[in-house]
Each structure stands twice: as C-alpha cells, then as structure tokens.
Amino acid sequence: ITMIGEYLKEDGNPKTKEQIENLVRNGMNKELRDRLCCRLTFGTAGLRSAMGAGFCYINDLTVIQSTQGMYKYLERCFSDFRQRGFVVGYDTRGQVTSSCSSKRLAKLTAAVLLAKGVPVYLFSKYVPTPFVPYAVRHLKAAAGVMITASHNRKEDNGYKVYWENGAQITSPHDKEILKCIEECVEPWNGSWNENLVDTSPLTRDPLEEISKIYMEDLKKICYHRELNTKTNLKFIHTSFHGVGHDYVQLAFKAFGFKPPIPVPEQKDPDPDFSTVKCPNPEEGESVLELSLRLAEKESARVVVATDPDADRLAVAELQENGRWKVFTGNELAALFGWWMFRSWKANSSKEADVKNVYMLATTVSSKILKAIARKEGFHFEETLPGFKWIGSRVKDLLDNGKEVLFQHPAGRQAPPGVAPLWHRIYTPADPSAPQFLLTARVGRWNVECGLADLHIPSVSPVLPSS
C-alpha cells in the first residue's frame, strides 16, 4: 500500500498513473508487487527495461528520478558542471499505452537539469547513438545520456550514460549514481516541466554542428575519394525502422559514393519495427529478407544493415554461387583491420612510426587483429568486453599521442567504411568474392600465428597487396 501511494503521488503521467490505478481496482496484487516493490538497477550501461508503469519500468518518473541522481552525482564530481553542461540524445522508440517515447524522455531528462541551471545540449531530432559520446567530447560536456534500447524488442527502452571522456561509465560511477538516485526519488520543482526545453536560454541544439563536424571527421579516414566517385558498385542499406537512414546517406556522401539504395519498407522510423521480429542485424538472413530481395532486384552485391540506433552493423555479400554471405563480427574486424592498416601505411610519411599505431579488441573477440599486429609490427591490446572499457582505453591512448586505427567491436568508422573497403576489394584484376579475400588472408595469419577460429578455404585467389 505504501509503494502504491508513493508511486501515485510521484507520477505525473496520467497514462502510467492510470495503469497502476486499474491494477489496484482489479485487485491484481502480484502485478502490483512486480511493478512497485523493486527499482530499476543502474549499471555501467545505465538503465534498460520495458516501458510502462512502475518503479522497475522505463517511464517518465523513473527517468526523472535517474536524472536527479545523475545531477546530484555530477555536481559532486565537477565543480564546473554548470559551465560544461550535459548532452541528451534519443532514438525513435515509443509506446502509446504509456505515452512514453524516447523524445519525451529526453525532454524530461533535459528539464530536470535545466531547472537546476545546467546547460543542456538537446538534439532537436533523433540521432545515432555515437553522436552523443562524440558530442560529449567535442563540446567538453561533463556527461551525456542517450535514450535508446538499441536493438532490443519494441517494448523496451533505455537510458545510456556517457562520461566526460565519451565512454560509457565504469564502476564505481554506476554504484555512486544509484546511491544518489535513491536519495532523491521525489521529483523536484521543475522536473516535470518539459516546456523548459523550449523556454530556457540554457537549451542548446547541437544537431547541425555535430552532424557537420562528425562527417568532416569521417572524411579523414577516406583515402580514395576520387576513385569512390567513379565506382559503379551498388549498396543496399536498411535502418530497421530506426535512426540510421539520413545519417548513413550523409556518411556515404562524405566518402564520395553514390547514396546507398534504401529498403523502402524499413527506411522511416517505426517504433513497432513492423517488418521484423527482432531489429537486430546480427540475426542474419532471417532479418535481412527485404534487403536481400531488393539487392537482387537492383543487381546490388552488398547489403549494409544498421540497428535502430545505428551503432551496430551487419554486412551481407552476394557470392559467386548465388548465395548470400552474412559476415560475422570477427570477419568484419579482420577486413576492417587489414583495410585501416593498409590505408595508414599507404598514406603515411616515411617517418611515421608503426610502433605508435594501435588496434584494440575485447577479450571475447577473435584474435585476428593480434595476428595482424604481430605480422605488421603495430601494437595490439585487449580490454574487457564492453564499449565502456574499449572507449576509455582509446581515450587514454589518444591523450598520450598514440594513433588508434581500429577497435573491435568497431566504432563510428564501420558503416561508411564498408563502401571503400568493398570498392577496393573489387578493384583488383581478379575480382574474387570478398569471402575468399577475407578468409584467405585470415587463413594465412591463422597458420602463421597458430589461430584456428576462422575457416580457411580451399581456394587461393589473388590478394590485394598489403
């Protein structure tokens, strides 16, 4: 009874409040206990749960409470928090029954901070998740939040936190933030006032600036723009009803390629993900059915898929036998690692020191980058699984003047990097299928380094020179 009263008192959203009132009216005590007797756990990835009413669901109230805890902790950590500000981005998720959408949750997140005099960089439009950590670093903000559940089912949403270094938070930040949340669960004055987003002089829209500079940064890893403009290679892209379409189009343009052909049924945002059972591109051919069908119609040999918040990638390629090859993450890492090192070597001065070059992977990833590093002479490091660990290490290396060419899982360079990589692969006189180019090269390194985690084919095609 106490928890019911507390929730109804604190929740300012009529729809979620009504959900709890209906459960009380219908005597659904077990459901009430499940929803109200435990709170969301705040971890190093922030929050993630189903949308709906209750303390253990993602909703207006729990996001306000979490942001109040974030404010309290950041105020303790940064004496200049009110000067540096906070970044907020969001995807296109939403749930009608609880009046809960990523955009609304982002506005409430901003309102909590604006009411406390903190400048908020709130994107005026949905953005890919990588834009938020990029903006945190570029704008020198204290931290940032992305409202997204990435490739999860449509019922879910999340609250992903990034620290000042652009990486997801690590312990003990998560535990300290959770303590702060528990100390201030009652909404403050102004926390429900989402109109502050439109009226406060502390609200800033970073969309145009970040989009422009992000794409300019992408151009720095584009080594053959003139050749790219002349290619006839076609690409199909699906964004799985998420944020990716506009931004992948911009990324291809930055590299000089013709825009990829979008899958029309999946191009526009749709919080119901109505054409796929699971909006995760790593599920393989089962979720790429519309993409592969369009590719065959358009005579395109390469399909690129991004998940709903555009931070996860899948690539499929038509083989000589007429079948589609969907590359694994480890196979893509081998290709991207080879491509980035080859491009670095071809475009560096003679004085460039390979010992200043790094590639990183997590401990659960393939050892292929380690094999390439051993052969080519650059540094390879492993981190614990998770973008938070690899991101923090990349930041440390960059701050110490090192050059990080690639990290697996791949970061922002992956989606636009597909096009020049495949264009280069098809450039040789013998246009062997990328599967063979990949596995033959990987196979050579596996034999040399005692690795056996990728298949070695029985063919020996001509390889692009390293």
Where are the regions that the model predicts?
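An N-terminal, well-structured beta->alpha segment
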Residues: 2-109, 200-231, 243
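Gly/Ser/Thr-enriched, mixed-charge loops and adjacent short helices
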Residues: 7, 11, 31-40, 157-295
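Conserved phosphate/anionic-ligand binding catalytic regions in large, soluble enzymes, centered on
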Residues: 36-56, 149-152, 235, 239-247, ...
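N-terminal small/polar loop signature for handling phosphorylated ligands or for N-terminal nucleophile
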Residues: 87-156, 251-253, 258-315, 383, ...
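Proline/glycine-rich low-complexity loops and linkers
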Residues: 124-125, 184-207, 318-409, 414-417
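Gly/Ser/Thr-rich active-site loops/lids in small-molecule metabolic enzymes
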Residues: 168-171, 262, 322-342, 424-432
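Arg/Gly-rich low-complexity intrinsically disordered repeat tracts
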Residues: 448-449
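Catalytic-core signal marking the mid-to-C-terminal active-site face
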Residues: 466
